Amino acid sequence: MGLEQPNNAAVEATSSTTSKLVFIRSRADYASFPCNDEAAVLADPTAAILVIGNEILSGKVADENARYLIGELRRLGVSLRRIEVIPDVVGEIAARVRALADTVDHLFTSGGVGPTHDDVTLEAVGEAFGMPIARNAELEGLLRNGYGPRLQERDLRMADIPVGARLEHGPGALGATWPVVVVRNVWVLPGVPSIFRRKFEAVRELFRAPPIHGRALYSRAGEGEIAGALDETVAQFAAAGVEVGSYPHLDAADYRVKITIDGRDPAAVDRALAFLAERLGDAVAKTE
């Protein structure tokens, strides 16, 4: 099918889950993209993760969801900009949701969506955007069908969501039975790791973007000795969107520093690696 590209700023790509993905370079064009059979995807999307729960901050429960999502977003081509962990306090959650949602394209929350007294995330997200909370008929029906005679009134709290939120089913298997609540660009996910993963997997293809390419160089010289070459590489390739990371490895047998070079343009990444390797000379232990 045909497609009119907003301001000639879109790039088409095919996907196994949609008839066509359209990568949008301009966020203004992304916001105004028409709703049709094509799926608009930002060419350079950013994300943040907000982990919510007193149990995480107290050390009673180890967070697994942020670590999982870091890897998934990387594989999808989404640049993660921030991770925060905050308590089950409505005002604090609302403030951080409001602030983070304004700085990234996708904000994922983890935790606080069950039927108990400390499950206040949806209330807080509603407060963040000035949206009242009301019972959603579709979610109530899913709860009644899922719980059957075991359903208690408090369980229906999980159907109380901000007015104006949308239910995103996604192409994955779980999406057909239990949707993800989305408020603007905030994706509200549960804290239980197994359910978090299943729900994200149902919608993960909605976030696919052009891949982030990565190379690595291992240096026999320490960071102090290679800092000048790193500075040169950063200055030379920053305009091409290349990011350089330097990570000492004190216990490695054959190198002292691992240097990563990442970017969306694979040719630029390769040029940056060659540029740095030339400056380090015999200090290069290996590249990959």
Task: Place the predicted regions along the sequence by residue.
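Low-acidity, Ser/Thr- and Arg-rich intrinsically disordered low-complexity segments
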Residues: 14-19, 25-26
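ATP/NTP phosphate-donor binding region
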Residues: 33, 41-91
